Design a protein with these regions (language model features):
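Alpha/beta-hydrolase superfamily serine-hydrolase fold, recognizing
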Residues: 1-277
Length: 277
């Protein structure tokens, strides 16, 4: 069993690589022989914007505690609609497992962290690791799968259809348009929804999950997240929901006391999951 101490303070280096042609991965590498646990990081941006640097505040802090963090770019809408980026993240999960030794990491410890729409994407890949629409990209000379040890979800869009209805009510034309640009139809929003997967009773993987969200998040209503957490638990999953009073969407991407507290919770949750066989 790997030893991970969330109170570690380790020097890190940053490496820029590619995990498939034209798609970059930034690896935050702790110094030392390891073996270290590892995380795939999936950024947000309404499935359309931003890149692998978005979650740098959290990624660096996690890496400094002794976790290899691989923050990935992926294909984005509107040129690459659903489920293209889920397939890329599925591949990235397999790639990190297959390359774990290169980063002094243990492939059996690989988890996922995702923020906003990235929380949706990493959740779908983890809940449906063998789905043919997600797992079709070949990874030569590897038999690794996309199952994940645990998930750290930061203000995640785990219910895209419910969020779409919400932004219609609030008149958020930008998110309406970008959601339509990625999914195309409301049927696709429901099919590719972690929340709807649970509501349908679809058989799925349920890795232990921590959700962090601010109560002032106007991007996805907290009650929807609470309903997801309840459904996840009802389906037999281990889930913790930590709400941050008065904090907005994306609050953890800005250095400060609340992002520090969020990262501390993530480290604690990771340590708990990694201590289990």
């Amino acid at each position: 069993m790997i030893k991970y101490d969330p109170d570690n303070r380790i020097e890190i280096t940053v490496k820029e690589l590619e995990y498939q042609d034209g798609l970059a991965v930034r690896v935050y590498q702790p110094a030392g022989a390891g073996p270290f646990p590892a995380l795939v990081d999936v950024h947000g941006g309404v499935w359309t914007n931003a890149d692998r640097t978005q979650n740098e505040v959290m990624d660096r802090a996690l890496a400094e505690s002794g976790i290899v963090v691989a923050a990935v770019d992926f294909r984005q809408a509107p040129d690459n609609p659903y489920p293209a980026q889920v397939a890329d993240v599925n591949l990235a999960s397999r790639w990190l497992k297959s390359r774990a030794a290169d980063f002094n990491a243990d492939p059996n410890t690989v988890g996922g962290i995702g923020s906003s729409s990235g929380g949706h994407t990493i959740s779908l890949s983890a809940m449906r690791p063998y789905h043919p629409d997600y797992s079709y990209i070949d990874l030569p000379d590897s038999d690794a799968d996309a199952t994940l040890k645990y998930l750290l979800l930061c203000w995640p869009i785990i219910a895209p259809y419910e969020r779409y209805k919400y932004v219609q009510e609030t008149g958020n034309d930008r998110i309406i348009g970008l959601s339509e640009g990625y999914f195309g139809t409301t049927d696709a929003m429901k099919e590719g929804s972690p929340f709807q997967i649970l509501k349908r009773g679809e058989k799925s993987a349920l890795p232990p999950t921590l959700i962090v969200q601010g109560t002032a998040d106007t991007n996805l209503p907290v009650p929807v997240t609470e309903r997801f957490a309840a459904a996840f638990q009802e389906a037999g999953g281990d889930i913790e929901l930590e709400l941050f009073p008065g904090m907005p969407h994306l609050f953890g991407n800005t250095a400060g006391p609340e992002s520090d507290r969020a990262v501390a919770l993530m480290k604690k949750f990771a340590a708990k999951c990694l201590s289990q066989a």
